[in-house]
Amino acid sequence: AAAPKSSTQNIAMNEVARESIRKDKNFHNGNYHDHNVIPKDGLKTARMLGHITYLSEEHMDNRFGRRFQDSESKLNKGIDFEIENYLQYKGDKFADSFDANSYILMTKAMDNYDAGKSQDINENLKKIEAKLLIIGFYSDWLYPPERGKEIQLAAMQNNINSSYVVLDGEHGHDSFLFHTDKYSKIIRKFISS
Protein backbone atom coordinates (compact mmCIF):
# COMPACT_ATOMS: atom_id res chain seq x y z
CA ALA A 1 0.00 0.00 0.00
CA ALA A 2 1.34 3.37 -0.99
CA ALA A 3 0.43 6.90 -1.90
CA PRO A 4 1.98 9.59 -4.08
CA LYS A 5 2.72 11.53 -0.88
CA SER A 6 2.18 11.38 2.86
CA SER A 7 -1.14 12.77 4.00
CA THR A 8 -1.45 15.57 6.51
CA GLN A 9 -2.71 13.01 9.03
CA ASN A 10 0.35 10.79 8.43
CA ILE A 11 2.63 13.76 9.01
CA ALA A 12 0.74 14.70 12.18
CA MET A 13 1.02 11.19 13.63
CA ASN A 14 4.72 11.05 12.81
CA GLU A 15 5.29 14.43 14.46
CA VAL A 16 3.65 13.25 17.68
CA ALA A 17 5.91 10.18 17.57
CA ARG A 18 9.03 12.30 16.99
CA GLU A 19 8.06 14.70 19.74
CA SER A 20 7.74 11.84 22.20
CA ILE A 21 11.35 10.93 21.41
CA ARG A 22 12.60 14.52 21.58
CA LYS A 23 10.90 15.03 24.97
CA ASP A 24 12.52 11.94 26.48
CA LYS A 25 14.96 13.06 29.20
CA ASN A 26 17.60 10.78 27.69
CA PHE A 27 17.38 12.24 24.17
CA HIS A 28 19.92 15.04 24.83
CA ASN A 29 19.09 16.81 21.58
CA GLY A 30 19.97 13.66 19.64
CA ASN A 31 23.35 13.19 21.33
CA TYR A 32 22.26 10.39 23.65
CA HIS A 33 25.17 8.12 22.65
CA ASP A 34 27.58 10.71 24.08
CA HIS A 35 25.80 10.28 27.42
CA ASN A 36 25.67 6.45 27.20
CA VAL A 37 21.88 6.46 27.40
CA ILE A 38 19.02 5.63 25.06
CA PRO A 39 15.70 7.53 24.91
CA LYS A 40 13.75 4.30 25.35
CA ASP A 41 10.62 5.86 26.85
CA GLY A 42 10.17 8.22 23.93
CA LEU A 43 10.99 5.57 21.35
CA LYS A 44 8.56 3.18 23.02
CA THR A 45 5.76 5.74 22.92
CA ALA A 46 6.56 6.59 19.29
CA ARG A 47 6.32 2.94 18.32
CA MET A 48 3.10 2.42 20.24
CA LEU A 49 1.51 5.29 18.32
CA GLY A 50 2.97 4.08 15.03
CA HIS A 51 1.77 0.55 15.66
CA ILE A 52 -1.80 1.76 16.10
CA THR A 53 -1.67 3.28 12.61
CA TYR A 54 -0.65 -0.07 11.11
CA LEU A 55 -3.72 -1.87 12.47
CA SER A 56 -7.35 -1.53 11.51
CA GLU A 57 -10.11 -0.92 14.01
CA GLU A 58 -11.72 -4.20 12.91
CA HIS A 59 -8.53 -6.13 13.62
CA MET A 60 -8.09 -4.54 17.04
CA ASP A 61 -11.73 -5.26 17.91
CA ASN A 62 -11.47 -8.87 16.75
CA ARG A 63 -8.14 -9.56 18.42
CA PHE A 64 -8.52 -7.59 21.65
CA GLY A 65 -11.99 -6.11 21.96
CA ARG A 66 -12.45 -4.57 25.36
CA ARG A 67 -11.10 -7.65 27.10
CA PHE A 68 -9.23 -7.19 30.33
CA GLN A 69 -5.66 -8.43 30.61
CA ASP A 70 -5.23 -11.42 32.90
CA SER A 71 -3.14 -10.64 35.96
CA GLU A 72 -0.47 -13.29 35.26
CA SER A 73 0.71 -11.75 31.99
CA LYS A 74 0.31 -8.03 32.76
CA LEU A 75 3.48 -6.10 31.99
CA ASN A 76 2.71 -3.63 34.77
CA LYS A 77 -0.01 -3.01 37.31
CA GLY A 78 -1.39 0.07 35.52
CA ILE A 79 -2.64 -2.05 32.61
CA ASP A 80 -6.29 -2.99 32.41
CA PHE A 81 -6.93 -4.03 28.80
CA GLU A 82 -5.29 -6.58 26.50
CA ILE A 83 -4.66 -3.88 23.88
CA GLU A 84 -2.70 -1.85 26.44
CA ASN A 85 -0.53 -4.85 27.29
CA TYR A 86 0.03 -5.58 23.58
CA LEU A 87 1.09 -2.00 22.82
CA GLN A 88 3.38 -1.93 25.87
CA TYR A 89 5.02 -5.16 24.69
CA LYS A 90 5.45 -3.91 21.10
CA GLY A 91 6.83 -0.58 22.31
CA ASP A 92 9.33 -2.20 24.68
CA LYS A 93 10.52 -4.66 22.04
CA PHE A 94 11.01 -1.90 19.47
CA ALA A 95 12.79 0.44 21.90
CA ASP A 96 15.31 -2.31 22.62
CA SER A 97 16.19 -2.78 18.96
CA PHE A 98 15.83 0.51 17.05
CA ASP A 99 17.81 3.74 17.09
CA ALA A 100 15.85 6.89 18.02
CA ASN A 101 17.65 9.22 15.59
CA SER A 102 17.07 6.70 12.80
CA TYR A 103 13.37 6.65 13.64
CA ILE A 104 13.21 10.44 13.47
CA LEU A 105 15.04 10.52 10.13
CA MET A 106 12.98 7.68 8.68
CA THR A 107 9.65 9.31 9.56
CA LYS A 108 10.88 12.69 8.27
CA ALA A 109 11.85 11.03 4.97
CA MET A 110 8.39 9.47 4.69
CA ASP A 111 6.74 12.81 5.48
CA ASN A 112 8.79 14.64 2.86
CA TYR A 113 8.27 12.07 0.12
CA ASP A 114 6.08 13.51 -2.62
CA ALA A 115 6.13 11.99 -6.10
CA GLY A 116 4.99 15.30 -7.57
CA LYS A 117 6.77 17.72 -5.23
CA SER A 118 9.15 19.33 -7.68
CA GLN A 119 6.61 19.17 -10.49
CA ASP A 120 3.36 17.53 -11.43
CA ILE A 121 3.24 13.80 -10.64
CA ASN A 122 2.50 13.19 -14.33
CA GLU A 123 5.88 14.67 -15.26
CA ASN A 124 7.66 12.34 -12.86
CA LEU A 125 5.73 9.30 -14.04
CA LYS A 126 6.73 9.98 -17.66
CA LYS A 127 10.23 8.84 -16.68
CA ILE A 128 8.99 5.36 -15.75
CA GLU A 129 9.58 2.68 -18.35
CA ALA A 130 8.44 -0.31 -16.28
CA LYS A 131 4.89 -1.46 -15.75
CA LEU A 132 3.34 -0.70 -12.36
CA LEU A 133 1.41 -2.85 -9.92
CA ILE A 134 -0.34 -0.99 -7.12
CA ILE A 135 -1.90 -3.07 -4.34
CA GLY A 136 -4.00 -1.66 -1.54
CA PHE A 137 -6.07 -3.02 1.31
CA TYR A 138 -9.59 -1.91 2.16
CA SER A 139 -8.81 -1.78 5.88
CA ASP A 140 -5.66 0.35 5.53
CA TRP A 141 -6.38 3.80 6.91
CA LEU A 142 -2.70 4.82 6.92
CA TYR A 143 -2.57 4.58 3.12
CA PRO A 144 -6.20 4.08 2.08
CA PRO A 145 -6.92 2.41 -1.28
CA GLU A 146 -7.96 5.65 -2.96
CA ARG A 147 -4.42 6.97 -2.45
CA GLY A 148 -3.02 4.08 -4.49
CA LYS A 149 -5.66 4.74 -7.12
CA GLU A 150 -4.19 8.26 -7.53
CA ILE A 151 -0.93 6.66 -8.64
CA GLN A 152 -2.67 4.37 -11.11
CA LEU A 153 -4.78 7.16 -12.63
CA ALA A 154 -1.67 9.28 -13.15
CA ALA A 155 0.08 6.26 -14.70
CA MET A 156 -2.84 5.72 -17.08
CA GLN A 157 -2.73 9.38 -18.12
CA ASN A 158 0.88 8.78 -19.11
CA ASN A 159 0.16 5.53 -20.98
CA ILE A 160 2.07 3.49 -18.42
CA ASN A 161 1.01 -0.13 -18.24
CA SER A 162 -0.40 -0.36 -14.73
CA SER A 163 -2.64 -2.55 -12.62
CA TYR A 164 -4.49 -1.58 -9.48
CA VAL A 165 -5.83 -4.14 -7.04
CA VAL A 166 -7.52 -3.66 -3.68
CA LEU A 167 -7.67 -6.68 -1.41
CA ASP A 168 -9.62 -7.55 1.68
CA GLY A 169 -7.45 -7.71 4.73
CA GLU A 170 -8.66 -6.98 8.21
CA HIS A 171 -5.19 -6.11 9.53
CA GLY A 172 -5.03 -2.54 8.21
CA HIS A 173 -1.68 -1.40 6.80
CA ASP A 174 -0.12 -4.60 8.16
CA SER A 175 -2.38 -6.72 5.93
CA PHE A 176 0.54 -7.36 3.59
CA LEU A 177 2.13 -9.43 6.38
CA PHE A 178 -0.82 -11.82 6.49
CA HIS A 179 -2.46 -14.06 3.91
CA THR A 180 0.43 -13.57 1.52
CA ASP A 181 -1.09 -16.16 -0.80
CA LYS A 182 -3.75 -13.58 -1.71
CA TYR A 183 -1.36 -11.10 -3.22
CA SER A 184 1.52 -13.39 -4.18
CA LYS A 185 -0.70 -14.85 -6.93
CA ILE A 186 -1.46 -11.33 -8.16
CA ILE A 187 2.23 -10.43 -8.17
CA ARG A 188 3.20 -13.63 -10.02
CA LYS A 189 0.49 -13.04 -12.62
CA PHE A 190 1.57 -9.41 -13.04
CA ILE A 191 5.25 -10.33 -13.48
CA SER A 192 4.48 -13.05 -16.02
CA SER A 193 2.15 -10.84 -18.09
Model-flagged regions — what are they?
Residues 128, 134-136:
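Short beta-strand/loop motif that positions the catalytic acidic residue
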Residues 89-90, 105-124:
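Active-site nucleophile elbow and catalytic-triad environment of alpha/beta-hydrolase enzymes
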Residues 149-193:
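Catalytic active-site module of serine/aspartate enzymes centered on a nucleophile-bearing elbow/loop
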Residues 3, 138-140:
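Residue-level signal for short, function-critical loop segments
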Residues 141-150:
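Conserved alpha/beta-hydrolase "acid-adjacent" motif
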Residues 1-93:
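Alpha/beta-hydrolase-fold enzymes
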Residues 125-129, 156-158:
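Short, conserved loop/helix-junction motifs that constitute active-site signature segments
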Residues 101-108, 185:
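Feature representing long, continuous alpha-helical segments
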